[in-house]
Amino acid sequence: MKMFNVKRLIGALVVCGLTMAVTAAPAHAGLVLGITDGNTVLSIADGSGFDNDGAVGGVGYSGAIGIWTLVMSTGDSDPIEPAPYPHMHLSVSARSSAASVSGNTTGLGDLFVSLTDTDFTTNAAQYKMSIGGSTNGTVTAGDWRDNGNIEFGSGIPLNTVGPLGSGGYSANVSSAWFTTAPALGYSVTIGSLFHNGSAGTSSGDFDLSTTTRAVPEPASLSLLGLGLVGLATRARRLQGKKQ
């Protein structure tokens, strides 16, 4: 994908994170939905007064922001989505009154919608991002892991796709394997950037799921190492007999 889109995704995450730092939220916010057009920033925590989804592990918003006259977005995490975790799903439908302007900060800008959750300890883990939807412009998406356990943290980029469009779009990508996790947990975030080419509606579903595998215990690793040493020794002996 184009580098400027990666920078814009991360920049929007930073804005959402700074807003959360100065906005009151429930004691155990955990799951947070972030929405910005580059001018206005909305952060909706699970269980807050702005959350129109009453379920624990689900957050929702419906309203207007800038030229985006109707934005409907929902986000789910555990315990709604099935294990293993993290497993998050973000759904967005956004209607604009005009074409959006990339990089604009006066209310005409593209729409960035993201979902973040914290306190994950899954190890080992590989993260898959699956997206699909339709647009009259382009859509860019990415997901991140942050070992500082920060909401909207972008410490470790996992996957990025796009810009995709116009028309229908879909993609499936997977990250590298992670074999260690911080003791206090880590956060994950999935984000989507909508650029409308004209007035109209764009939509998308964005899923972040996790694949796990067993991590060998130290004793098992030692046995594996001894096995390799034995095989190497036998190979050298056989080679010596052939000479």
Question: What do these predicted regions represent?
Answer:
Residues 5-30, 199-230:
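Short, threonine-centered small-residue motifs that mark membrane-proximal processing/anchoring sites
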Residues 28-214:
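Helix-boundary and membrane-interface capping/anchor signal
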Residues 127, 227, 235-237:
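Short linear functional motifs in flexible/disordered or boundary regions
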Residues 137, 229-234:
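Short, electropositive, low-hydrophobicity segments enriched in small/polar residues
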Residues 232-243:
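C-terminal membrane-anchoring or membrane-association module
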